Amino acid sequence: MPRNLVLFDLEWNIGYKPFTFNYHGVQQTLRGEIIEIGAVKIDEDANVLDTFSIHLRPRIFRSLQHHIAKVTGLTQEDLDKGEPILQGLRRFMKWCGPDAEFAEWGLDDVPVLKQNLFLCNLDESRPTVWYDLQQIFLREHPRKEGEGMKLESVVTRMGIPMERPFHDALSDTLYTCLLYT
């Protein structure tokens, strides 16, 4: 088990029109611009040592896409009041520390994090190691026919009390932490 394990979740906004950029000589489409980060540092027994939560103000996709608003419950005002994305990402990566290994439910968020770090001219070489906790969970709890793998479905299946809203980055991270234990 890594000494500095950070479980995290991102909520990201998408544009009404695609945004393409040159990423190390390759044209890429931005998958999403981060608008919320939730993270926990855990010890080897999966006890929560510290939490991190922040709303970010995007630079590229400034208008909150209606589907994202519906899913997350965030408003345009939440985005407008968020910490500027550059400062927020810098603060998050500093909180994680240089030796952090990341874990998430699925593998969607690390590529989005790396794209956003790059677009903010921040070091996107970290994390160098990250884990897909969904796959680790499946080894212990094989999926049955018709069972969904969305976080909410798995939390329900495992009988974990749903005391926090889903699609809130910190809440989703804390649910993931409960599944990890």
Task: Enumerate the language-model features and the residues they cover.
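Conserved non-catalytic scaffold segment of RNase H-like nuclease domains
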Residues: 2-111, 118, 152, 156-157
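Active-site flanking residues adjacent to catalytic metal/cofactor-binding acidic residues
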Residues: 8, 131, 171
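Short, glycine/acidic-enriched loop or turn micro-motifs at the edges of active sites
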Residues: 12-14, 135, 175
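A short alpha->loop->secondary-structure connector
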Residues: 117-127
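A structural motif
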Residues: 122, 143-156
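Short alpha-helix plus adjacent loop in nuclease-associated cores
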Residues: 131-146
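Alpha-helical transmembrane segments that form the membrane-embedded catalytic/substrate-binding core
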Residues: 169-176
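Conserved small/polar residues in nucleotide/adenosyl-binding loops
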Residues: 180-181
